Swiss-Prot record:
GO terms for biological process: ribosome biogenesis. The gene is obg. It comes from Ureaplasma parvum serovar 3 (strain ATCC 700970). InterPro entries: G_OBG, GTP-bd, GTP-bd_Obg/CgtA, GTP-bd_prot_GTP1/OBG_C_sf, GTP1-OBG_CS, GTP1_OBG_dom, GTP1_OBG_dom_sf, OBG_GTPase. This is GTPase Obg. Its cofactor is Mg(2+). Residues 160-329 form the OBG-type G domain. Belongs to the TRAFAC class OBG-HflX-like GTPase superfamily. OBG GTPase family.
Length: 435
């Protein structure tokens, strides 16, 4: 199965249901009055952080995700049912981008935190809503709002709690297979692992995910080898295991092998070297390993502890793992406390939608003369109300005209050169201009 850490999807929220015109017809109610119900709200689409998810694989073939529309209103003042919202569980560490501007819209790091991505449209009002002392029998109704339609880019920057890094053939795949459920491909040649391999263990009712990050080589920070594709995955790990092979056949120059990884981390992002890094020397059972270990110790001059193991024979692996997990829990506690102080429980993603809500409408209009007596008029305010108010009743025609008057529509047309009898196109509506 391919590892999916980036995908682009279109999210289409549901439209609001339409309101209706209806009248009470009971024989014992001589002046029945309006009885048209409102439409239900369209379904919204949310992202939900979920610690049980580890990949975006489930979105690989879902290019478009839709929520259902609200139901239309009914007679006897019955409102249409609201559509159910759609909740998409994504792994913690998922970053949501605007694919056009590359702006970060959300950084999902808390389990069960919800992010509103595409908002469903409000239901349209039925004629009962418009009843007033001045209009006891309104022949007015609205269509439901359109749901938001957005495209987002998802990138998984955290695939694991603990990352295992090192040069190719350091023994990372063998190590992760000794204490987790991972079954990576292992062999004695470089780049056996071409995708991150995830393994899971449980401690104190906590699930801890390890990632065998494919081997790094010199120049990885510039994209050489597997480069950027996998360096980004270690940015969000709580700590790193720097695994180095003591086998002279793998690393005849042990100092260069050590510094290659350290330098690549620094070059990619300086703060990576500030993470807790546990240095683990592997293959201690190989000929020449003790000599390489001594060279490494002398070079580090007690500035960093070296944990010595053999992943192949499982020598000292359990002790090393216990120490790593203690560091992990300490780092996780600090991180979660910071998040609680900074973030609310739920967030609404802020972006410019092509379906603005009525309270946020820009009333600016653009008038284009397309022929001698034909004008086309555009604008957010016009687009919104041209959809919401169907011109099928006299009352709705009057209401739509009032919306036009509120933005000095006629005056602006006169200034643009319109005269009586000209055709005015407002999206799907064509009107005859009257001075």
């Amino acid at each position: 199965m391919a590892f999916i850490d980036k995908c682009k999807i279109v999210l289409i929220a549901g439209n609001g249901g339409d309101g209706i015109v209806s009248w009470r017809r009971e024989t014992h109610v001589p002046e029945g009055g309006p009885a048209g119900g409102n439409g239900g709200n369209g379904g919204s689409i949310w992202f939900v952080g979920n610690h049980n998810e580890t990949s975006l694989e489930f979105l690989k073939y879902k290019k478009i995700i839709r929520a259902k529309h609200g139901e239309k209103g009914d007679i006897k003042n019955q409102h249409g049912a609201n559509a159910e919202d759609v909740f998409i569980n994504v792994p913690l560490g998922t970053v949501v981008y605007n694919p056009i501007t590359n702006e970060i819209l959300a950084d999902i790091n808390i389990d069960q935190q919800k992010y509103l991505v595409a908002q469903g449209g409000l239901g349209g009002h039925g004629n009962t809503h418009f009843k007033s002392p001045f209009n006891k029998a309104p022949n007015l109704y609205e269509l439901g709002e359109l749901g938001e339609n957005v495209e987002v880019l998802l990138e998984l920057k955290t695939i694991a709690d603990i990352g295992i890094i090192g040069l190719p053939n350091a023994g990372k795949s063998t190590l992760i297979s000794t204490f987790t459920n991972a079954k990576p491909k292992t062999a004695n040649y470089m780049f056996t692992t071409l995708n991150p391999v995830l393994g899971t263990i449980y401690r104190d009712q906590n699930r801890i995910i390890f990632a065998d990050i494919p081997g790094l080589i010199e120049g990885a920070h510039t994209g050489v080898g597997l480069g950027h594709d996998f360096l980004k995955h270690i940015e969000r790990c709580f700590l790193l295991i720097h695994l180095i092979s003591l086998d002279p056949n793998d690393n005849p120059d042990i100092i260069n092998a050590y510094e290659t990884i350290v330098n690549e981390l620094k070059q990619y992002k300086q703060n990576l070297v500030n993470k807790p890094i546990v240095l683990v020397a592997n293959k201690i059972d190989q000929i020449g390993a003790l000599e390489n270990l001594q060279i490494l110790k002398e070079y580090l001059k007690n500035n960093q502890e070296i944990k010595i193991i053999s992943a192949l024979t499982n020598l000292h692996v359990d002790n090393m793992l216990d120490d790593v997990i203690k560091i992990y829990f300490a780092q996780k506690k600090i991180y979660e406390q910071r998040l609680k102080e900074q973030l609310p429980v739920d967030q609404i993603l802020k972006w410019t939608s092509d379906i603005p809500k009525s309270k946020e409408l820009d009333k600016t209009i653009e008038i284009i003369k397309v022929d001698d007596h034909i004008f086309e008029v555009f604008g957010e305010y016009l687009k919104y109300w041209a959809h919401r108010i169907p011109l099928k009743t006299q009352d709705n025609l009057i209401r739509f005209n009032q919306k036009l008057q509120s933005i000095n529509f006629n005056q602006q047309l006169l200034q643009a050169g319109a005269v009586a009898g000209d055709s005015i196109k407002i999206y799907d509506i064509t009107l005859e201009f009257e001075e």
